[in-house]
Amino acid sequence: MASSSSVAVRELPLFPLPEVVLFPGRPLPLQIFEFRYRIMMNTIMESDRRFGVLMWDPNQNKVSAVGCCAEVIHCQRLPDDRMKIMTLGQQRFRVLDAVREKPYLVGLVEWIEDAPPQQDLRPLGKDVEQLLRDVVRLSSKLMDQSIDLPEDIPSLPTELSYWVASYLYGAATEQQTLLELQDTAARLERETEILTSTRNHLAARTVLKDTLK
């Protein structure tokens, strides 16, 4: 079978997950217990070990059209036929059409990438990284405990933009918007806005805490 990166359009097994957004280069652990998804995993483990993760909004009962391909890098089979798997995000895709729905959803997808940058994105990336450090520093002060940034912060702007987006816990809709952007600069700029707002909020709380001491 040809690798997915060499095919512009292909069929891909799809796994909608409630309020979960996967980004390229980011890990996603899953526990597989539904029969249809056990069938899916058994099938893909005999081929290229890849499937598509789509964010499902349970409030609107809507599945996003843009998702991220996941590759199974580890699979543990349990005695009761459940599976514990670790996956890693690969490239993003857009669903063009549903091929079939049983025993599990399969879609016809096209791969999508960011447009070539029109500017040097390194300064924007450095701004985002500094904002991250500010947020961590202020969070540490508020919680009276040491919080360290993970050591795996990417240096390349595109990878950094995915890395930051993956840590926006509890904001699946915002994460989905960032996933769908095909402009690294626009993604980093939006993350700058989010982190600036977070930093300012934390700074205000820190001042209040110091005042009340």
Residue spans of the language-model regions?
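N-terminal low-complexity, acidic/polar interaction/targeting segments
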Residues: 1-213
